[in-house]
């Protein structure tokens, strides 16, 4: 039987990632092609998924992201596919239980180079939250504009919660000082898992298996204990209105949130590199 898709349905299908289209094609023999019966989106950019599609997206994106952890789109898809039905609602409820969290849900602020003046942040005192954020972005060579838009979470409010978590991720890097090297990302994901309970952050810790032996030892002896201890005892970071904290002292904010700054990973890696270089020279 041949299928004739309207241009609108072709557009819907084109928005689906390759892994999800594979899942759709596998199920075509047992039921009608799901794109033909896709529900109406709940918000701009929303792609509704069936349970089979969501499971396929979760498994496919998790496996592919393990082998290529720099594919932010795969990590984002895995995060959305595994956040429902429970975990993203728990995070939303944590915001609803906090006066600041409720304000964030009401105001719906977004974090990007359009909403934050990077030029102004670079003029703040060196210990200000905004200056630490801008300096971290400059040092790591990243931009606040690289976060994908949420599209696989059905509830519109929960979709914003996931978007907010995603856009705040670099602030977590900035206040902890962890770099975006794989070792630093694994440490931060462990911290986020203890603080948010989002499954994707926990799954990301499997990337520790891809680290070098010395890096794995550092993770298990230094950064995993720090991440789990601080993630559990710290306040819910999803409730931090970062836009209102930019001129505060980063040390003061860390103390208020209950976060101890970890050992400087870049300095540890630099010292290790220098030690190896000295050994080769002798």
Curated annotation (Swiss-Prot):
The record's catalysed reaction(s) read:
a 4-hydroxy-3-methoxy-5-(all-trans-polyprenyl)benzoate + H(+) = a 2-methoxy-6-(all-trans-polyprenyl)phenol + CO2
Keyword Membrane in the entry? The reply is: yes
Can you cite an annotated GO cellular component?
mitochondrion
What are the required cofactors?
Zn(2+)
Compartments in which it is found: Mitochondrion inner membrane
Q: How does it sit in the membrane?
A: Peripheral membrane protein
Q: In which pathway does it act?
A: Cofactor biosynthesis; ubiquinone biosynthesis
Q: Enumerate the InterPro entries for this protein.
A: Coq4, Coq4_euk
What is the protein's major site of localization?
mitochondrion
Which GO annotations describe the biological process of this protein? Answer: ubiquinone biosynthetic process
Record key words, sorted:
Lyase, Membrane, Metal-binding, Mitochondrion, Mitochondrion inner membrane, Ubiquinone biosynthesis, Zinc
Broadest EC class? Answer: lyase
Q: What is its EC number?
A: 4.1.1.130
Q: Which residues bind Zn(2+)?
A: 169-170, 173, 185
Q: What else is known?
A: This protein may be expected to contain an N-terminal transit peptide but none has been predicted.
This protein's assembly is summarised as: Component of a multi-subunit COQ enzyme complex, composed of at least coq3, coq4, coq5, coq6, coq7 and coq9.
Q: Please state which protein family the record places this protein in.
A: Belongs to the COQ4 family.
Primary role: Lyase that catalyzes the C1-decarboxylation of 4-hydroxy-3-methoxy-5-(all-trans-polyprenyl)benzoic acid into 2-methoxy-6-(all-trans-polyprenyl)phenol during ubiquinone biosynthesis.
**Name of the protein described by the UniProt record:** Ubiquinone biosynthesis protein coq4, mitochondrial
- Origin organism is Sclerotinia sclerotiorum (strain ATCC 18683 / 1980 / Ss-1)
Upper taxonomic lineage: Eukaryota, Fungi, Dikarya, Ascomycota, Pezizomycotina
